[in-house]
Amino acid sequence: MKHTLTVLALCTLVAHASSGAVRGVPSDRVGGDLKGSHPGYMRVWVEKGARKVNVDSTGVILKGYDVVGYFTQDKAVKGSPKYQATYQGATYYFSSAADLATFKKDPSKYVPQYGGYCANGMKNSKLADSDPTVFSIVKGKLYVYEHSAAKKEFHTHSLEHVIKADHNWYQMFE
């Protein structure tokens, strides 16, 4: 397991080291019973294989924001229940039939990292809720954050923090 994580970290390092631009960035691990936990932590978990996704009580991820819109419009766009798809235990809303069709062609390209939990929280081994209007796209991957300060902190050492968050995610759910 340790060797696998080392290889994963090195692969992530190489992938991010050959990076391009970062879009969307301005020029205690929680488990078991969550009753009474910090209000920033989601209280609803949905199994998706061996992983968890951050959804509301109806199973909707990212509070209904359109994951394709982050990539095509470079902004958070509210989706509609009229256009929806379920993928790996979460329901995704889209702002248009075109975005829904795009998602269905390659869902893994658009899903948020760390199941939609705050990337900075995951860096610290915490499952913190996210605000879907606070996001970045790094190397073609969507990251969401609890608030703008978390996003800023995560991007102070982006490569290092992605590697650490990836490691923590695999420790929790793999």
Question: Where is each model-derived feature located?
Answer:
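Mature extracytoplasmic domains of secretory-pathway proteins
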Residues: 93-95, 100-106
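Intrinsically disordered, low-complexity terminal tails and linkers in eukaryotic proteins, enriched
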Residues: 18-88, 108-174
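Sec-dependent N-terminal signal peptides
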Residues: 4-13
